[in-house]
């Protein structure tokens, strides 16, 4: 069993053992439905849960006892948690819902200034350790983070809580978000067997995949860029 499959199974077991309602989504769902595997070129393994059923703190507690899952910083306003595990990132996506759609928002990559603002906010404001902050599978990204941290460390400890709040609010306005949305009627699930685990997926998985990846979702594309090519992007609802 390769490391991707191993951490997939471990994540499923952690969620199941703690009675978390979840489903497989995004590129993970795509790989399983199209190829019956986790896509080797995909950089993360995606799980969806409902934000009105479980909090980030609750999920963090469940993963904190496993030293192989290393948490990364995620802005509070983003609807997910990230853990590095092996060569991939485990993404726990907290979907919001109303009577029409299910939706999620993330920071929009590609805007370097926006990403820098986000990194500044959550290093200054977070209690997460230095080691976790610089965690990255990309050596260059890790070096860049270390250089930024050397600049930010004095700010973190010198600034008052009140000033940090003001800085947080000001920088937060400069961050751009987008995300996926699905008709709420597609968010019903069935169980399949994958890697020896019983896992939930949307009953109409193919329709869900077409909504995100388009009618050619069955054709592999290794250079897919979600924030430019997804068909169901939204601004903040």
What is each residue range found by the language model?
Residues 23, 47, 227-231:
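Long, positively charged, glycine-interspersed low-complexity recognition regions
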Residues 23, 41, 216-217, 226:
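Tryptophan-centered motif/residue detector
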Residues 31, 48-50, 200:
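General alpha-helical segment detector with a strong preference for membrane-spanning helices
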Residues 30, 55, 98-100:
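Surface-exposed, flexible loop/turn segments at secondary-structure boundaries
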Residues 36-58, 196:
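Catalytic metal-binding acidic patch
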Residues 12-45:
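Active-site nucleotide-donor binding segment shared across nucleotidyl transfer reactions
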